[in-house]
């Protein structure tokens, strides 16, 4: 009846998905800031 593996059931829980999503978002921001520095900071005129 339940043929889903325990690892797949664990990986589809909300805290795990949220943690993975935050790591991906942080990685994108870090790499963007590495290749294009100072674009994330806009000083006031």
UniProtKB/Swiss-Prot annotation:
Instruction: Work out whether the entry's keyword set contains Transmembrane.
Output: yes
Keyword field: Membrane, Photosynthesis, Photosystem I, Thylakoid, Transmembrane, Transmembrane helix
Coiled coil (UniProt feature): none
User: Among the record's GO biological process terms, what is one?
Assistant: photosynthesis
Its transmembrane ranges are: 10-30
Query: Does GTP-binding appear among the keywords?
Result: no
Q: How does it sit in the membrane?
A: Single-pass membrane protein
Per the record, what is one GO cellular component?
A: photosystem I
Please give the Gene3D superfamilies that the UniProt record associates with this protein.
Answer: Single helix bin
Main subcellular localisation: membrane
State the compartments where it is located.
Answer: Cellular thylakoid membrane
One Pfam family of this protein, by short name? Answer: PSI_PsaJ
Indicate the family of this protein: Belongs to the PsaJ family.
Per its database record, what is this protein's job? May help in the organization of the PsaE and PsaF subunits.
- What's the name of the protein? Photosystem I reaction center subunit IX
Write the gene name.
psaJ
């Amino acid at each position: 009846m339940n043929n889903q593996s325990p690892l797949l059931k664990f990986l589809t829980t909300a805290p795990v998905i949220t943690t993975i999503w935050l790591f991906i978002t942080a990685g994108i921001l870090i790499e963007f800031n590495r290749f294009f520095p100072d674009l994330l900071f806009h000083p006031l005129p």
